[in-house]
């Protein structure tokens, strides 16, 4: 789910502050501890080979985040693609790969246990 910042409802606007809120932006019920993550990614990075060996060869962890700069495209198990770019909020449900279309920096919030499993898997893949 991609939402441009401009499409997030303004709940309050006063001199010096604009408060935007998107409700019902995914469900974290039962996911336990959440980790805050900062990723800096170069154009061309593709997680497909790094996710080989995970269930469905995809990241099975949901993520909520914000794109500070750049552009990324996710592909799900059915082949559906979605592109997020600078100033977009996003929710990536379980079952995705990510390709970096333009140098990017993102902030994500993910279930700590599930995403640590994925990150450790990628570390092992890179080691060879």
Task: List where the protein language model places each region.
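A short, N-terminal "cap"/entry segment at the start of jelly-roll beta-barrel domains
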Residues: 1-48, 55-56, 128
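Conserved hydrophobic/aromatic beta-strand scaffold that supports enzyme active sites
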Residues: 5, 20, 36-38, 64, ...
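Ligand-binding loop in jelly-roll beta-barrel domains
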Residues: 32-34, 94-119
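Short histidine-centered beta-strand/loop micro-motifs
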Residues: 48-58, 76, 82-83
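Short, conserved beta-strand element in jelly-roll/cupin
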Residues: 57-74
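A generic structural motif
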Residues: 73-77, 99-101
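Short acidic-glycine-tyrosine-enriched beta hairpin
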Residues: 76-95
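Acidic/histidine-enriched, glycine/proline-rich intrinsically disordered or flexible terminal extensions
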Residues: 116-128
